[in-house]
Amino acid sequence: MKATELKDKSVEELNTELLNLLREQFNLRMQASTGQLEKTDQIRKVRRSIARVKTILTQKAAA
């Protein structure tokens, strides 16, 4: 998801998105540790999406 799309969302929606991403990150880590994950770049994409959401949340809190 792009940062411009995230800026339009409310804080509650961003928190929900963050929880979903954290769950997805956990699942991907488990798949990677058991050798089931074929597309290892997904972990990096999810990690960066988490960073985007946290950045937008911080910006909204400061505003």
UniProtKB/Swiss-Prot annotation:
Example GO BP: translation
Domain of life (superkingdom): Bacteria
InterPro entries in UniProt: Ribosomal_protein_uL29, Ribosomal_uL29, Ribosomal_uL29_sf
Tagged with keyword Ribonucleoprotein: yes
CDD domains, per database record: Ribosomal_L29_HIP
GO MF, one annotated term: structural constituent of ribosome
Residues forming coiled coils: none
Cellular component per GO, a single term: cytosolic large ribosomal subunit
Protein keywords: Ribonucleoprotein, Ribosomal protein
Pfam family, one: Ribosomal_L29
NCBIfam families: L29
Family: Belongs to the universal ribosomal protein uL29 family.
Matching HAMAP family: Ribosomal_uL29 (MF_00374)
PANTHER family: 60S RIBOSOMAL PROTEIN L35/50S RIBOSOMAL PROTEIN L29, LARGE RIBOSOMAL SUBUNIT PROTEIN UL29C
Official protein name in the record: Large ribosomal subunit protein uL29
Organism: Pseudoalteromonas atlantica (strain T6c / ATCC BAA-1087)
Source species taxonomy: Bacteria, Pseudomonadati, Pseudomonadota, Gammaproteobacteria, Alteromonadales
Name of the gene encoding the protein in the UniProt record: rpmC
